[in-house]
């Protein structure tokens, strides 16, 4: 970890648009659609809004509750009771009730803070989902481009094998090659054609995956065909400590930990008495014309103090439950941090190793191409049979495909590294507790 490079100001990526580092307009356009049209992100955004409303609900408990009910009751007493009865009466009521629970011990305030911190965690989870789907799209895109590279390679190979088939056919017609040479060349050509056709399946699957990530029907998207034209650009890594502020999943677990801590305080408040104030006032009359009049008024007001005398250990268990839940969030936070460091280190190593592997594979392709040229020359001179040519052709194609695959893996690893670093996200993007409570 200590070997990470210190990020310089010029290293910074455009905030929120880390994919622009690849300088690919088509990728840029697809990435822009993820935030707008991805249905999983729409669900995560709705969950964040739900969490914000939960904050408002918790905050409403800080204020009195006022209710009013208008009623008209027509009643007749039983004529067989000992008490005077049998008469019929109508009662008109318009009571207004006010109830208020004083937050003496801060339990309601803690509930508001816990809900707000949970909403912050929900926002961080939304941003983590956004980063995850953006990275998934970029990986699918480069896998598709890698498939395009293999297709282009096989198309060139098919043309080359057609020329070799013509060469063996001409030599057979001139009596200097056997029919086996022609059959082998034809088999080699047919195999390459089959491989080329098979790549269409993989390409279609990557195209369908991109369509779904951008909120489209799988068959409705068509991505132009061209191979990867760049090598992985340098990714600004920075210092390990900065990772704690750059990953939204770390921010989410930290906020969950804060919310769980507030729940411990809420559980402890149950040990103290609850003070509430009740007020009832309104108008009541048995005569409609006198209902809305000053003499019909009534009111009652008074405080109430409630304390649990015995609960068989319920409150103690609730505190223990809240403490255990908090301990779980602490462990989850630590594990998330460790996993984040691992992901960064894994992809840094992958990029370094794959770069060396790419250089070695390029040398192998050059050597295989030279070997094929020599075998072809020797075959034309009649010093070797066609099997030697086929062997060198297979080695060259294998090395060329491997070179394309390594480049694809390098691009994918660079995307995974950016994702592991949190993209362009920063903890400063979290909404404040006040903003969450006010719905901004």
Model regions: which residues?
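Terminal intrinsically disordered/low-complexity segments used for targeting and assembly
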Residues: 1-36, 92, 116, 200-245, ...
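Outer-membrane beta-barrel pore domains and translocons
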Residues: 69-75, 99, 125, 147, ...
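Periplasmic alpha-helical coiled-coil/stalk elements that build and connect Gram-negative outer-membrane
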Residues: 108, 124-239, 350, 354, ...
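A short glycine-centered flexible hinge/capping loop motif at secondary-structure junctions
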Residues: 172-176, 379-383, 420-424
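Short flexible linkers and secondary-structure junctions
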Residues: 1-138, 274-279, 312-319
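Sec/SRP-type N-terminal targeting helices
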Residues: 42-43, 59, 102-130, 180, ...
């Amino acid at each position: 970890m200590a070997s990470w490079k210190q990020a310089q100001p010029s290293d910074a990526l455009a905030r929120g648009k880390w994919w622009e580092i690849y300088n690919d307009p088509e990728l840029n356009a697809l990435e822009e659609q993820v935030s707008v049209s991805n249905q999983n992100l729409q669900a995560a955004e709705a969950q964040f809004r739900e969490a914000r409303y939960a904050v408002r609900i918790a905050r409403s408990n800080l204020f009195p509750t006022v209710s009013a009910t208008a009623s008209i009751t027509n009643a007749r007493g039983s004529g067989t009771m000992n008490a005077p009865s049998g008469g019929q009466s109508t009662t008109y009521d318009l009571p207004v009730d006010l109830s208020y629970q004083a937050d003496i011990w801060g339990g309601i305030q803690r509930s508001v803070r816990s809900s707000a911190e949970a909403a912050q965690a929900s926002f961080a989870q939304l941003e983590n989902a956004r980063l995850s789907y953006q990275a998934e799209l970029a990986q699918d895109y480069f896998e598709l481009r890698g498939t395009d590279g293999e297709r282009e390679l096989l198309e060139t190979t098919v043309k080359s094998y057609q020329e070799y088939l013509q060469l063996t056919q001409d030599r057979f017609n001139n009596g200097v090659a056997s029919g086996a040479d022609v059959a082998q060349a034809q088999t080699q050509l047919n195999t390459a054609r089959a491989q080329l056709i098979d790549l269409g399946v993989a390409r279609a699957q990557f195209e369908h995956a991109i369509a779904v990530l951008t909120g489209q029907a799988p068959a409705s998207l068509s991505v132009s065909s061209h191979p990867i034209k760049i090598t992985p650009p340098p990714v600004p890594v920075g210092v390990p400590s900065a990772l704690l502020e750059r990953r939204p999943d770390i921010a989410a677990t930290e906020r969950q930990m804060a919310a769980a801590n507030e729940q411990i305080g809420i559980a402890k408040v149950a040990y103290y008495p609850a003070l509430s104030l009740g007020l009832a006032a309104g108008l009541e009359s048995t005569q409609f014309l006198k209902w809305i009049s000053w003499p019909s008024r009534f009111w009652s007001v008074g405080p109430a103090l409630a304390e649990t005398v015995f609960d068989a250990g319920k409150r103690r268990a609730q505190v223990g439950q809240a403490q255990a839940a908090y301990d779980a969030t602490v462990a989850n936070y630590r594990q998330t941090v460790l996993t984040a460091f691992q992901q960064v280190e894994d992809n840094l190593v992958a990029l370094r190793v794959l770069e060396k592997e790419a250089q070695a594979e390029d040398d192998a392709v050059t050597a295989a191409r030279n070997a094929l040229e020599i075998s072809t020359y020797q075959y034309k001179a009649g010093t070797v049979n066609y099997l030697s040519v086929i062997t060198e052709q297979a080695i060259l194609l294998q090395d060329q495909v491997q070179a394309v695959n390594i480049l694809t893996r390098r691009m994918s690893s660079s995307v995974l590294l950016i994702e592991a670093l949190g993209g362009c996200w920063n903890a400063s993007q979290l909404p404040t507790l006040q903003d969450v409570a006010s719905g901004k």
